[in-house]
């Protein structure tokens, strides 16, 4: 709860006038408890899980962009995708939503705030960079562990039921995997705590990234292609394509860990063979044309 009865009192306490965004935030949250504000995290995640993958459903259903589909032989029906969404929503209600509620004391403990002032753009960007780097590194090692015999058979194999991933399948996993992977997601905000709005932006962007990575489509116009060391859909799709025996492409977001620790060798060999195959097919077409 914001400890100021009016906007004027808040302005006096801050020593300046509130920005437009701060005024809107004050009007909305001033009478709400910190716990009530934090519970909005559940709504944020529900909207992201439900709405962000939906355009990919249209893309898959219509076939308008099949030229960009990575595994072209695999096609999902509307029924398949709706079934995946239902399973994800069960996980959301039973695991994700519950986890958000019971984790509130840890939010208080690390110092994630919901009052004024709101963070500056530079503060938000700096914290998001830290969060992505911390999550990526810790997620890499947890993901590698999940591909050991016990971790895969007992937990991670459920996520790999989709050998050709789709957007709604990004959070499709064993309940234990959801809980375990919550650790790297929360670790960044725990180390560099910020505002609850930054926290919401962080978990939203992380889910957007996961949905794109599991989209099954490699769109050439994606702005994420401009991000250095970004893995993306084609990179992660190989991991799902290989399946349970995969010891390659564990990266959550960036590819540097796979490169440093040598877990992208299979992928690089695959890319070379694919490139060689494409060249041979192009040469065969050229020869046939001249004949």
Curated annotation (Swiss-Prot):
Its main location: endoplasmic reticulum. It is found in: Endoplasmic reticulum membrane. Residues 128-263 form the Fatty acid hydroxylase domain. One of its GO terms (biological process) is sterol biosynthetic process. One of its GO terms (cellular component) is endoplasmic reticulum. Its EC number is 1.14.18.11, 1.14.18.9. It comes from the Eukaryota. Disruption phenotype: The double mutant smo1-1 smo1-3 shows no obvious phenotype. It is an enzyme of class 1 (oxidoreductase). The chain crosses the membrane at residues 41-61, 92-112, 114-134, 178-198. A motif (Histidine box-3) lies at residues 235-241. A motif (Histidine box-2) lies at residues 156-160. One of its GO terms (molecular function) is C-4 methylsterol oxidase activity. The histidine box domains may contain the active site and/or be involved in metal ion binding. Interacts with ACBP1. This is Methylsterol monooxygenase 1-3. The gene is SMO1-3.
């Amino acid at each position: 709860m914001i400890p100021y009865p009016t906007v004027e009192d808040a302005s006096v306490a801050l020593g300046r006038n509130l920005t437009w965004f701060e005024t809107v935030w004050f009007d909305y949250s001033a009478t709400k408890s910190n716990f009530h504000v934090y519970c909005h995290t559940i709504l944020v995640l529900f909207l992201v899980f439900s709405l962000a993958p939906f355009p990919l459903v249209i893309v898959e259903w219509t076939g308008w962009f099949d030229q960009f589909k990575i595994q072209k032989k695999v096609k999902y029906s509307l029924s398949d995708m709706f079934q995946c969404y239902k399973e994800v929503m069960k996980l959301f209600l039973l695991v994700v939503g519950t986890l958000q509620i019971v984790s509130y004391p840890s939010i208080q403990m690390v110092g994630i705030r919901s009052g004024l002032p709101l963070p500056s753009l530079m503060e938000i960007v700096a914290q998001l960079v830290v969060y992505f780097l911390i999550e990526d590194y810790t997620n890499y090692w947890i993901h590698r562990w999940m591909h050991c015999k016990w971790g895969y058979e007992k937990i991670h194999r459920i996520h790999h039921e989709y050998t050709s991933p789709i957007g709604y399948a990004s959070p499709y996993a064993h309940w234990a995997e959801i809980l375990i992977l919550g650790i790297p997601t929360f670790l960044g905000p725990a180390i560099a705590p910020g505002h609850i709005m930054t926290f919401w932006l962080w978990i939203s962007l992380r889910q957007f990234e996961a949905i794109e990575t599991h989209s099954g489509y490699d769109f050439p116009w994606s702005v994420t292609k401009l991000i250095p060391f970004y893995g993306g859909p084609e990179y992660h799709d190989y991991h799902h394509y290989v399946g349970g025996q995969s010891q390659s492409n564990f990266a959550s977001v960036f590819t540097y860990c796979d490169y440093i620790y040598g877990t992208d060798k299979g992928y690089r060999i695959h890319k070379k063979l694919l490139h060689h195959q494409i060249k041979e097919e192009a040469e065969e077409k050229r020869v046939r044309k001249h004949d």
